Every structure is written in C-alpha cells, then in structure tokens.
Amino acid sequence: MSVSVNINNVTKEYRIYRNNKERIKDALIPKNKNNTFFALDDVSITAHEGDVIGLVGINGSGKSTLSNMIGGSISPTSGNIERNGEVSVIAINAGLNGRLTGVENIEFKMLCMGFKRKEIKQLMPQVIEFSELGEFIHQPVKNYSSGMRAKLGFSINVTINPDILVIDEALSVGDQTFTQKCLDKIYEFKEANKTIFFVSHNIRQVREFCTKIAWIEGGKLKEYGDLEEVLPKYEQFLKDFKKKSKADQKAFRKGLDEKRFIVK
C-alpha cells in the first residue's frame, strides 16, 4: 500500500504568557526568553492506504493537537506533514458555525472544500438523511446539543467521501443507534482502503476497529505499531493508572507536564 500521510518530526510549541506585558515584550524583543509549552515534541508517524490508526493517551497528551495538524487547521512549529489525498476532520463543532443553520453549514463547509453549488444541491439530501436531524436541520447550530452537532459534522464529512478521515471523539456523543450507523460507514471506508485516524477513549471501539496504535504520552510518541503489539501495553498502563490514588494520578500528570515546559 502507498503512503497516504507522512508525519515527519513534528513539534508544536506554544509560548506561555502570565500577562499582557510578557506578551508585548515577547513581540518587541525577538530573542526574549519565555516559558514554552510543547504540545507535541518530535512526533513521526507513517500511515498507508487502508491503515486505521488509533490515537490513544490520557487527557492532555496531545492527541487532538495531532489530529488537528493532520487535518490542516493547526500548523507545526517544526517538521512537516505530507498528505496524499483529501482530508476531512470529524470532531464536535469542527468547521461548524453556530450562527448558521444546519443547511447553511452544509453549504458553507462544502463550498470551502471546493464543491460547486450544483454538486452541493445533489449531495444535500444525502447529508440531511444521514444526519437524522429532521426539521432541526433548519435551526441555528448554536441551538444544537453536542450529539446533534456531531451528527451534522459526521454526515457532511462521510458524504464528501474523503481519502483520509480524522475522527476525534465524535462518536463519544449521541445515541447508540446513530453511533452504530457511523461505525458501519467507517467500516465501508476501511474496506475501500481509506486512511483513518481514530481518536477515542473507548478501548472496545479501538480494539474492534483499528489496525495500528499510536500511543501519545506527554506530547511524545511513546509507541507506534500494530494493534496486537501496542494496545495490550496501553491497556495495562490504564489499569495501573486507574489503581493509583487521585493524588498519585495528579502527580503523574504534573510530572509529564513539567517536562513539556522549557524556557527558550
């Protein structure tokens, strides 16, 4: 299978300011030193056609930062990401404008993706039918529940038939019937040899669905490999982590975060 996504030594840094004075000083003095947070640090992953890669890790590890970078909404500070094909990101609120109705969001998002109005008109009924939103499709998205927003976002993205699909916790909300319908659609994409990045805390879904695992911990790629090789290690880590007291869990997270801050 040919390479669909190549993530090369990607790092994402954020300057941390305690107040506006520090922010202004940093802007005026290029070599000014300040606290820098590494959301991701030197991550490299190669994905091929047909790969379904589970991005796993505890909250705050950097999974969503990586998924947004794959989708193109965030640029790396260093390194690069090569994508061979159209990419769609499915996340709660991803690409949705709360002031627009469901229909208007469909039109707007598809126009941004390069679809012509005639094509949008042809695809619109499919999106609406898949979403199961009924008359709510004509209401402003700001009035939607998180589950309804996820339904709309998922429906748009699967209808446009992307080559590379990034799913960031979008199946963690909504009813079970719709979630199963989404999973069935994702299986179709898997059978069509599309590349899928699947961000989820649902280990059962990850085990059922993914072929490879990228374990992100403290902004670094701890392990990347076949599902059978990496997932058991991550599951054991979760078991051990959950046995810790709340104080020990907090200390563990704090230890990881401290390593991600440097002055530069």
Swiss-Prot record:
Q: Which residues form the ABC transporter domain?
A: 24-243
Question: How is this protein positioned relative to the membrane?
Answer: Peripheral membrane protein
Top-tier EC class:
translocase
Q: Where in the cell is it found?
A: Cell membrane
**Which terms in the Gene Ontology molecular function aspect does this entry carry?**
ABC-type teichoic acid transporter activity; ATP binding; ATP hydrolysis activity
Signal peptide residues are: none
Q: Which reaction does it catalyse?
A: ATP + H2O + teichoic acidSide 1 = ADP + phosphate + teichoic acidSide 2
Per UniProt, the keywords (alphabetical) are: ATP-binding, Cell membrane, Membrane, Nucleotide-binding, Translocase, Transport
Q: Which sites bind ATP? A: 57-64
Task: Give the E.C. number(s).
Answer: 7.5.2.4
What is the superkingdom listed in this entry's lineage?
Answer: Bacteria
Q: What sections of the protein cross the membrane?
A: none
One GO cellular component term of this record is: plasma membrane
Q: What does this protein do?
A: Part of the ABC transporter complex TagGH involved in teichoic acids export. Responsible for energy coupling to the transport system.
- Give the record's subunit note: The complex is composed of two ATP-binding proteins (TagH) and two transmembrane proteins (TagG).
Q: Which family does it belong to?
A: Belongs to the ABC transporter superfamily. Teichoic acids exporter (TC 3.A.1.104.1) family.
Name under which the protein is recorded: Teichoic acids export ATP-binding protein TagH
Organism this protein belongs to: Staphylococcus haemolyticus (strain JCSC1435)
* Record lineage: Bacteria, Bacillati, Bacillota, Bacilli, Bacillales
Which gene produces this protein?
tagH
